[in-house]
Amino acid sequence: MKDSEKYRPVRNTQEIAKNIIVLDGFSSSGKSLVGSICGYLERGEYWQINYTYERLSILNYLGEMSDDSTSAILKLEVDNHLYNLSIGRDVNFRKTDLSSPFYDGRESAYLERISEKDGDSVIRAIIKKNPIIPLHMHYIFGHSDILFKGFGDKLKLYIVMLRNPLYLIDTWHRQNWVNLICKKERDFHMCCNYNNHVIPWFVVDYANEYQKANDFEKAVLTVYNYYNKVFEMYDKLSEPRKTKTMIIVYEKLIVDPNFYVDTMCASLKTKRRNDFDKIMKRLNLPRDLDDSSFLSHDIFIKTYKDQLSEKYIGLLQELEVNYRAFISRFI
């Protein structure tokens, strides 16, 4: 169709979801803990994994979707998502999944919604309640300008989870993600073609180096470059966007969760539900950190020295220094 500017996609005259939380971070960084906490704040909906938001963000970052198109679909999707949650549609009722309301004891609220009448009365109820909807994403911050732009004032809090990068590298390697992503049929990450090779979308900025690396070096590169993107994007945020961005450090969250919960409540203009202690007990928060969270540089290098060149040892040292300097601003 010609004259695309004349017919550019928009969703500017309809609005359902007005209180969005983006919950973002690397795998094993503690997102599910914070997602469960969000569900026990007043007006908080239960968190669910919906890959549509991150896939839209990825396609926009890769230049495959315009800002206008991506923004319009983001708004459509979150409004539709909230409406469906409000009538018990598309809720994950698998009892063993972390992203199921059964996991945190909120199943009765969503099961009751299944039998409720749908339609305009639901919209009126949503507008009256003004619910908070958390959107769970994976390693998008650093590539996520479109989420700020697309959601605009609807985005009330962008939470970025951080954790000891040596632990994340160790976990990524032990779980063999390098040989699962874009290779196994049950993997659903966005993939890209690079020189007739299929690579994960998040390595496109260092694809050549990634292709030459061994499996363990690929794990190092993945976390190293992700964290560099996080540091860079945060420091370049405008003050209004920085104000709604919350850095949560896993090691601090575990021992002092109320440090973050208080900030979340203030940012979202809400408070803890009367049964909030129930979820803290279920999540075993606060608690002491286990030994793996203290994975030191020396132990890490000793464990993996046979798989690391001097170059990668240098990258690890740089990453650790930069990480400690960055998180010192938030704890």
Language-model-detected regions and their locations in the chain:
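PAPS-dependent sulfotransferases, especially Golgi type II membrane carbohydrate sulfotransferases
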Residues: 1-21, 198-247, 253-331
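Hydrophobic/aromatic beta-strand patches that form the interior of the parallel beta-sheet core
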Residues: 21, 45, 157-160, 246-248
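P-loop (Walker A) phosphate-binding loop of NTP-binding proteins
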Residues: 25-26
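A long, hydrophobic alpha-helical segment
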Residues: 126-131, 135-151, 208-212
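Conserved phosphate-donor/acceptor-positioning beta-strand/loop module used by diverse small-molecule
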Residues: 136-139, 153-174
